[in-house]
């Protein structure tokens, strides 16, 4: 995920307390009510008073209250809900309500959303700007590129700038974007460079490969980001650099190199086997948390790229695990679920018991706090629920996800 995940992973892996998912008051801490266990109908109307109360409740401290509010808004007729959400985004006194209203609006497939997101890009509220920029990663509008490129000169928020650069990377066919992002690979703060490097890799930005190879050769905090991005881009000629690094790099970097070479399509079974071995070793042996993070992230990258065996390995090891390994595995699975939702759901549905995997996903969502991406995940799951036949495995899985993750 974005660079913030590294910070979240460090915090999670250094803690011996129960995960956020398991703690009291977190997602899934209380059983769902009987009414929430089945999606009985596509829409449930709200009165104007009920809708106003629900929107106000999006900002409540009580998790159950704000979750119930979001559920009711999502399931109300869009024609009635959208105008109220737009008004709340513009005028509500609570900044967090404005943010959550914008996230929910993103999943309602309304034509007015585009203009609201454009306005959010210039909001004073960092959360709103983050959602505004991130929305256009998946809903591209080339006409906005000059504005977003201009924002690179002024945007300095640690939450907003990664979303901005990721959306620009999604427009990687544009010469102006290529020039701007290539320059950001080798200059600027490491935190922001990490986000740029990851985004370029995810969108297979071969235009930046020479700069990425330069970073990969240097010891430092960005070396693993660059190595993995090189693998994602998929140019087999890069294997010479990766093989050279493999001979000299420290142990903690070896899983990342193995994942990158596998992503190039070279000797993948051997390198994936090494990733599994390093994961098992770091789970069983104290003092190897860097190796643990690298192993899970490597398997996660393979899973996102379409490797079902890598997802299965994470689920197999993650189900019975405990922290610190559990947090690292959950984060890797969360990244796969958000970046390659259809494949993740396919693998999860094939499991004899998907519930341990769903529990891991809930823990990941609590750590990641990727609200917009999680909303996209929910929309995909609920769409799949209604598309699947009644009592089919696909519908049962979707129902369990909706219930457990409290969408």
State where each predicted segment sits.
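Intrinsic disorder/low-complexity segments in short proteins, especially the signal peptide
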Residues: 12-13, 18, 26, 304, ...
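Compositionally biased regions
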Residues: 15-16, 20, 34-37, 245, ...
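Alpha-solenoid HEAT/Armadillo-like helical repeat scaffolds in large eukaryotic proteins
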Residues: 53-57, 61, 84-92, 116-124, ...
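Structural detector for internal amphipathic alpha-helices that build alpha-solenoid repeat scaffolds
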Residues: 34-46, 64-78, 87, 96-110, ...
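Sec-dependent N-terminal signal peptides
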Residues: 1-20
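Compositionally biased, proline/threonine/alanine/serine-rich low-complexity intrinsically disordered stretches
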Residues: 20-52
């Amino acid at each position: 995920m974005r660079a913030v995940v590294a910070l979240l992973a460090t915090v999670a892996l250094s803690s011996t307390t129960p995960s956020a998912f398991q703690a009291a008051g977190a997602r899934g801490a209380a059983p769902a009510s009987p009414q929430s266990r089945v999606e009985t109908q596509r829409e449930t109307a709200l009165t104007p008073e009920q809708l106003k109360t629900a929107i106000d409740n999006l900002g409540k401290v009580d998790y159950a209250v704000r979750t119930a509010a979001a559920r009711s808004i999502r399931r109300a007729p869009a024609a009635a809900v959208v105008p109220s959400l737009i008004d709340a985004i513009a005028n509500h006194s609570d900044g967090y309500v404005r943010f959550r209203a914008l996230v929910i609006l993103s999943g309602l497939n309304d034509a007015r959303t585009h203009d609201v997101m454009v306005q959010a890009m210039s909001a004073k509220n960092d959360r709103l700007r983050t959602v505004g920029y991130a929305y256009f990663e998946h809903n591209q509008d080339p006409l906005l590129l000059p504005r977003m490129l201009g924002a690179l000169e002024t945007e300095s928020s640690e939450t907003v700038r990664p979303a901005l650069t990721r959306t620009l990377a999604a427009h990687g066919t544009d010469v102006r974007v290529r020039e701007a992002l290539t320059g950001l690979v080798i200059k600027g703060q490491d935190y922001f460079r990490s986000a740029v490097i990851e985004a370029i890799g995810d969108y297979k930005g071969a235009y930046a490969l020479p700069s990425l190879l330069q970073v990969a050769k240097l010891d430092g905090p960005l070396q693993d980001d660059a190595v993995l991005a090189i693998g994602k881009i998929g140019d087999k000629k890069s294997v010479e650099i990766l093989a050279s690094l493999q001979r000299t790099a420290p142990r903690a970097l070896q899983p990342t190199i193995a994942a990158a070479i596998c992503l190039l399509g070279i000797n993948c079974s051997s390198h994936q086997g090494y990733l599994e071995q390093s994961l098992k070793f770091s789970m069983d042996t104290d003092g190897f948390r860097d190796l643990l993070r690298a192993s899970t992230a490597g398997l996660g990258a393979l899973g996102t790229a379409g490797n079902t065996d890598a997802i299965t390995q994470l689920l197999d090891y993650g189900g019975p695990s405990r922290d610190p390994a559990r947090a690292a595995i959950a984060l890797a699975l969360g990244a796969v679920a958000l970046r390659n939702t259809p494949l993740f759901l396919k693998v999860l549905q094939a499991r004899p018991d998907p519930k341990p995997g769903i529990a891991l996903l809930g823990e990941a969502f609590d750590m990641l706090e990727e609200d917009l991406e999680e909303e996209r995940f929910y929309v995909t799951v609920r769409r799949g629920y209604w598309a699947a036949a009644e009592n089919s495995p696909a519908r049962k899985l979707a129902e369990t996800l909706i219930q457990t993750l409290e969408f």
